[in-house]
Structure formats: C-alpha cells, structure tokens
C-alpha cells in the first residue's frame, strides 16, 4: 500500500484463464507498476483507466504474473522495499533480498513443469497461497523432458500436468507427484533436480533464492554444452523459427562465439573450482580447459551418436 511499493515497475505476462498449461511465449507482455497491477487485481472486471496497461484485459477472465524477477536486475527500489522483510540467514544461508527472486501474480498464474539444473531452491510464501506439484528426479523418464523452449538452467516437461494426455505421453500416467500448498509464512525446500509445477491459488507473492551445491560446476558444464548445441542449430534456422526455440527470458540467440566462451569458462571452473571467474580470459591459449575440436570430437564420438540415434528412435514410438 505504500507509495514506494506502488511505484515499482517490472514486466508482466498476461493470459486468459483456462485449464491447460500456458508457455511463456504464448502470453501477452506489458510493462506496469505494482500499483497499476493492484488496481486491476482489485477490480471486478474491466477498469476504466486508459493509462493502466492492464485496462485492456478483463480481470475476471485473465491472470497476470511478474515471475522470475531477479532483484539485482530490477531497480534499486525493489531491494530497498524487500530488504527489511526478506532474509535467509535463519536458514543458514548467507543471502539477502538482493540475491532473491520475486514472483507476484493473480490466481491461475503458473509456471510450467520444469527442473532446475543446478542449486537447491528455498521458497518463502509472503502473501496468498500457491500449489506446488513436485516430482522426484527418478520420475524424469515419465515426464518427457525437452529443451525447447530453451532456457538456460531449466529443463521443461512436455507433459501438461493440468491436462495430461496419456495417449501421447503414456508413461506420464505412472508419475507420482507430491502436492504441497504454501500459505503465508511457509518456506519450501526444493531439493536439487526435483521437478516442479507451481500455480497461484490466490493473488500471491513469494520470493526464492537458489543455493549452490558442490556438484553445480559439472551441471554448469552440461548447460554450456546445451547452449552451444542450441545456438548452433537455432542459428541455422530462419530468424522467426530460431526465436521460437527460445523462452522469452533468454532475450535472443547468442552467437556461437559467445556460447563457446561460456563453455570455456564452465570447463575451466571444473579444472579450477576456486578460480575467480573474472581473472582469466576465454582464449584457448590462456590455459583453456578444452579446444573447439575436442568438443566436436566428444559430441560426435560413435558411442554418443549411438545414444542420440537410440533416443530419436524411442521418440518415434
């Protein structure tokens, strides 16, 4: 209710309410303040406010979500507002509001089923309720993972848990979720690589923080290779198709050179875990962890190609 909170600005995604999971690329995107969002959220339907970006959407038939908002990437006003109320030290975590991520949305807003590739997740529910469906990493084969849309550090499921289709994804019927409803004051610990689908049951505000684990360096190396492959393939497609491969959070297609630099960094960290990533270059001659040729040789090794063919054949059944 404070003027400082009402003036906070960010990007929101909006979509009609419905019974199926919505991908981010299928949403409307708009820039608005928290105050404009709250005026719309409290309305009974449409609002008569030409200056409010939400005015063209009927509140009764649409949801809105400001999700995955890293406080460090927002204006300093966000950190100033959250700093007095968000802290993780009581959980033995040396992080604060500036390290957190904000999720604010109306009932029906949701995040598709996905798996974070590194870190464990701590989630604090500040307002409203959220439903979480969690699946063990052992369920991965039943959830039909995909990297399209591509988002760094996220592996999505092709299964729509809101409207599952066992005829297309028969193994999904065997998946056993753990359902949790978070209420204000609750904190949820999401173990590494656990799949999760999240839906707001009311207008909801939550914050989370990811905590590094000792084996994250290996997962970052895998993510770097995934980015190289996606960059290489998407770059050879038409601009429209290539963009369709990317989640909106990615911003655009990286160049192959940029992706290789990230891979170089990731593998160098595997060699030297305590190395300050700001203190070395990305040129292979600067003690690089691998050469581009070595990467090509690894990806095209006969045993790797055999596994790829086997996976492709399984996907046709």
Where in this protein do the model-derived segments appear?
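N-terminal accessory scaffold of Fe(II)-dependent oxygenases
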Residues: 1-187, 195-317
